[in-house]
Amino acid sequence: MRFVQKIAQFIKEKELDLGALTIIVPSDRAINKIKQELSNLYSIPILSPQIITIDKWMRTEDKSKIDPTRQLITLHEISAQLAPFKDQSFEEFLSWGNTLLKDFDEVDRYLLDAKAVFKNLKSIKELETWQIDDEELSSSQKKFKEFWGHIPELYTRFNKRLQKDKKTTSGRAYRDFNDAIIDEASRLTGNHKFIFAGFNALSISELSVMKKLIDKKCAFFLSDADTFYTRDSIHEAGSFIKKNHEFLNVDYPIPLLKSIDNKKMNITIVECSQQIGQVKVAANELNNLSVEEQNNTLVLLCDESLISSVTKNIPANIDKTNVSLGLPITQTAIKSWVDILFQIQENKLKFGTESIYFYDFQRFINHSVTLSCTSIQEMYLLGDIERDAIKKNRIFQSIEAIKISDLMSEVVGLTFENWNKDWKKALSNIRTLNSVIIKNISKENSFERTILQVFDESLVELQNIIEEGIPEMNQKSFKLFFDQHWSQKNIAFKGDQKEGVQVMGLLETRLLDFKHIIALGMNEGKLPATNQINSFIPMDLRAALGLPTTREKQGLFAHHFYRLLHHCDTLTATYSSNNEQLGPQEKSRYLLQLELELQRINKNINITNKFYNVPIEKASSENAQVIEKSELIMGRIEKHFNRAISASSINTYLRCPLDFYYRYIAELGEEKSIEEDIESQQFGSLIHNTLEKLFDKHALFDSLGNENIPKPRALEEVDLNQMLIDYKALLYNEFLNYFDNESQLFLEGKNLVSYTIAQDTIENTIKKELEFLKKQSEPFYIVQVEAKKEISLDVLVSGQKKTIHFKGYIDRIDKIGDAYRVIDYKSGKVKEADVKFKLKDNDLLVSFTNCKHAVQLALYSLFFKHSFGAYPNEAIIYSLTDVSKMDHKLSYANHNLTDICELFETFIEEVLNEIFDESSSVEHNEKSKYCNYCQ
């Protein structure tokens, strides 16, 4: 017989008057069950007794309970009147205010003398700071001592204020109810009876109330326990039960069970390598249940963070499900939405601009809350703005630019308006924003509407508090204050408590019994929970005062768990061994106790250990790094080579054919984003651009090859000395343009280092040029800078002539006397092997691959020949970061540049024949780094 049935049986056997009976239970879930059992037991219509939770029963009707946020504000107002706390900021107060309120609550709940408790605490703290010598205490040590000395006064003033406002805390309500219980009992009719059913861990105030009624012979105390754990003096599951009966001086009106010792039960313990694996195990178990079994099945969430995954993975065969513990709103998109709203304000303060920081804009437009009220057209327009910002590296975005519709204008205005530390305005904006979004959320986004509504409802009381006035605080403090208020809210699920699979947390299961239990998250640290007790009262003093210590806090879960075994036939318990999750990866001690203790005593218990790994679906191809050249892909290759190609595309193919395929054939490009910190490529571009502007005015031809008029004279020392003056303004403008006119982004922090290095690099380069110029006996001309070049080469591919077009930009062409040089700037280091060409085993593909810059310099030499009729005398890489060895010339043993260029044309033909070979596949080069698409 289940415990709720025994309660009903007890009432009937005692012939208790249902109209003069109050049944007090630990939680709401048991109320309907008891009513149902009473209805089943009595064959005639009955008047239901009052059935109420102990928390509701012990609240005084003349005082309303004050919420935690108001408690905090009230305590702060009181503390500000006392000398040690007058100069404290609200942020400093937050570091201790919540903890002290919890201690006040426990002192009341356990009927302790507050003055004595905090006097003891003061003595302990003084001992901790006691010094053996006579050295005078520092000012901070004096403040520390004063703090502990004023806690009793804080407690007294706080309670007087509550009394004046006709408010109460949970703990104070329990203390007051204990004082008034005899009057309350006398107020009821003479034969009124009370039943306290299914309690485990109780505070002194609760026990004291019960004892007073039991001593008056008008109350019964009914425990749901088994001799397996009550007869053992050290078993934690029975410790509270025995203490309760000793304190109340009562026996067991409902005899203890003797079930766990000899009952049959199948226990399966499943180790899961992934957190989600536990949910999959539950889904598999539920899938095998009959309809009858479903009505007797509990999914127990020892790790309540699994609730969202569990509700999404309930199999289709489960007719009815009731989820009782609620989805914490912090496990929804609201948490990240709130973080975005506050981060926007944080960055407004940080950057001192009314514009929108790009990453705030990006997070905002891609967040599910924004998307839930955004039309398809608005999404496209916002996406265009995002892509344009990335293309132009626009770190800050104009607010007006994203007001693309009436709705978006309103949403953007409310989201990005400056709060200016006006918290009344901040909350008003957030609530108005909630209202606008809720009103415009599409039908298919009903979940987003629900979470926003729950979030908004939680802010109503906070808005009232702020309207009444709150202390001055900074944004960080307001965020803590704000989060504390809304983060405890849950989203209730709809369901039938009478039928179907029940999904609960451990506390909701009190008084309820199930035949089939699926317990998820049974890791040590989750069950029992190892949450630290947040208290100023040390553990040894807590133990001496009778306050719960960590041991008691953990021990109360033991009875809740073992009680579920009373009527259980099958238990499937999972735990995660995933190293990436927070907390221990071991199975709960309760599972170890079942294996090591219970199985030894009860031979009818069958325990099986299993391992579950989420199956990984096989990919469509055995090797994802292989692309076969289908007709479609060959068409794309043909299309690519019908356009002009660059040296970098050929080099990409040499490094990794698969990278070449993704970037140039599939045209995925590279993942782009806004860069706040200058990467090497962009850093080099800014230096290149500055050098181009410095030398362009001295060039004989413009970038397209048109002759500049008037014709510039040869470069002289005076020109380079002027460059040493001009470069700073040019470089500054390059950086300013790159950072979208936000100079503070490169005049401080990490980017200032890059800016300084860029200045040094250009100055050293010009000085090196000046040194080089002084050594020349013939005129030095700048022929062209950033020269745009194109050529076409005819090659044989699979026996057929194919014309390949090349394009590129030569950083600089210069002339000393009659000798021409083509120069490419590199902001990185250059090795000798990068420009020293070696023909290895007559394999041109390997040879050009091994000489990093050979393809580029050979192609640039061909560009030069096409424009000027002959090859240049030298093809050079300028290493801007190593001025000691700045010019690195392309060389080939005893050969000249012409020989390399002729080999290059043959090499291009070989590369293209390999690329156009339909029988070969595109594969990743194992020696190459993986690109984003190969990973």
Segments from the language model and where they lie:
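Conserved motor-region signature of P-loop NTPase helicases/translocases
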Residues: M1-S48, I54-K56, D183-T353, L512-D513
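Basic/charged alpha-beta structural segments of nucleotide/phosphate-handling enzymes
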Residues: V25-L188, I204, Y380-E386
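Accessory helical subdomains and C-terminal extensions of nucleic-acid helicases
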Residues: Q81-K115, E136, E292-Q294, I314-T321, ...
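Conserved helicase NTPase motor core
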Residues: W130-F240, E271, K515-H516, I687, ...
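Accessory C-terminal helicase-associated subdomains
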Residues: S139-Q163, G190, N287, A401-E508, ...
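RecB-family 4Fe-4S metal-dependent nuclease core
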Residues: I518, T574, Q581, N623-Q935
